[in-house]
């Protein structure tokens, strides 16, 4: 029995490793036809991933400090209502869209953050946020992402079979950007940080890699060493009379 269990685990890990390699190394070939791959102005390729994991205010911050993440934004997906709004989501979920460089970070690493940043076993919400709009969903772009998401969902399930993982895995349909006041929410709660990067207009704030990182920093979701490094950089800038922060 132990030998069979060991063989099953080995097979699972082998399948997972194969899919990780395919989803990263083969991404350009597989996804060039459509849904998740774009070409940046500098010639490099970027990919997008969309997740629902509770309130999108904090969810956006969970991904902003990752090396290789280019920008983040929040919105609505997974429902049938055209043009949903925050006060009228209907059957949509609050979600975060992550644009990243697949040469620097793998889709699997984004999934790891997804699982670690919420409780996928909760039903009808997350923590104090109750409602269908806070459900757990992995929105996939293509077969490779769907298969990898399913394998990692099973990995999470086998950790504890006393309760069921509620996360749904479904193809990404339309993504509707949320209203400006919901973008970079954690960052906007710290006006001095917004001022520190030059009070960027909403469009630039939405597309800024620096703003995505500071949004994570404001929520204290960067790794401890990174949090400390950014704090030191901000202190240094403040001592110089608050010039504009260009990078962290």
Describe each region flagged by the PLM.
Residues 2-248:
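Flexible coil/turn and secondary-structure edge motifs
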């Amino acid at each position: 029995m132990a030998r069979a269990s060991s063989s099953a685990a080995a097979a699972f890990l082998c399948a997972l490793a194969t899919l990780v390699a395919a989803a990263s190394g083969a991404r350009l070939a597989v996804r060039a036809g459509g849904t998740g791959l774009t070409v940046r102005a500098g010639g490099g390729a970027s990919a997008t991933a969309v997740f629902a994991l509770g309130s999108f205010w904090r969810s956006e911050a969970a991904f902003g400090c990752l090396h290789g993440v280019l920008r983040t934004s929040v919105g609505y997906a997974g429902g049938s209502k055209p043009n949903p709004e925050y006060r009228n989501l209907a059957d949509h979920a609050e979600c975060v869209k992550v644009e990243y460089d697949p040469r620097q970070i793998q889709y699997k690493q984004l999934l790891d953050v997804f699982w670690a940043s919420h409780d996928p076993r909760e039903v009808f919400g997350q923590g104090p946020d109750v409602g269908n709009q806070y459900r757990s969903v992995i929105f996939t772009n293509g077969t490779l992402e769907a298969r990898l998401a399913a394998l990692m969902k099973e990995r999470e399930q086998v950790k504890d079979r006393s309760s069921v993982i509620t996360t749904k895995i479904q193809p990404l349909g339309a993504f509707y950007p949320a209203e400006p006041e919901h973008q970079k929410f954690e960052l906007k709660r710290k006006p001095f940080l917004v001022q520190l990067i030059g009070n960027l207009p909403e469009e630039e704030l939405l597309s800024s890699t620096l703003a995505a990182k500071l949004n994570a920093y404001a929520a204290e979701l960067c790794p401890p060493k990174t949090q400390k490094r950014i704090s030191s950089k901000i202190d240094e800038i403040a001592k110089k009379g608050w010039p504009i922060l260009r990078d962290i």
